[in-house]
């Protein structure tokens, strides 16, 4: 919000002076951001905003990870203290599932070190692990059938993400030596 004053110095013409009375807050910035979003992108933004709230209520999680700004995208990255890899949490509205993985940037050797322990990693995650190797990046990936489009499933999804992210951090600490 602006306030306009008219100033005059001596015999000069009056000139406007603009004073900022109120600056935009995060709410107005968020509103500008979401104006052009699709329904699916709005859902993603709401989902990750809710995840940030769930994260802040979990002491084990907040000791290990820092929240980042919720964005209207299908992934949410968590730093685990290495520039070589991070934890990626994903939602898939088309397949009605969610996933979590260690995402390794351009380091096949590191991926192979983890893969040497694939049975133990699968046991730790209590899940069948998909070992995805691509040209630039590799992923140690798991999914579960929780539909991110159904808001009543979100608490279950958040709990799954919180649990699996902590386990992935334990995996990284144990096998990245």
Give the role of each language-model region.
Residues 2-8, 31-34, 93-102, 156-170:
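Short, surface-exposed, charge-dense and proline/glycine-enriched linear segments
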């Amino acid at each position: 919000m602006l306030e306009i004053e008219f100033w005059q110095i001596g015999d000069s013409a009056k000139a406007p002076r603009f004073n900022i009375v109120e600056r935009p807050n995060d709410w107005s910035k968020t509103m500008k951001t979401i104006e052009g979003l699709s329904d699916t992108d709005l859902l993603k933004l709401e989902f990750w905003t809710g995840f940030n709230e769930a994260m802040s209520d979990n002491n084990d999680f907040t000791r290990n990870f820092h929240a980042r700004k919720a964005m209207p995208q299908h992934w949410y990255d968590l730093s685990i203290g290495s520039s070589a890899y991070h934890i990626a949490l994903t939602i898939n509205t088309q397949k009605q599932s969610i996933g979590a993985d260690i995402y390794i940037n351009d380091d096949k050797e590191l991926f192979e070190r983890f893969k040497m322990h694939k049975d133990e990693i699968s046991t730790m995650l209590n899940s069948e692990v998909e070992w995805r190797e691509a040209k630039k990046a590799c992923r140690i990936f798991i999914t579960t059938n929780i539909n991110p489009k159904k808001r009543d499933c979100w608490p279950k999804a958040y709990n799954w993400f919180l649990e699996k992210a902590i386990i992935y951090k334990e995996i990284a600490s144990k096998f990245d030596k």
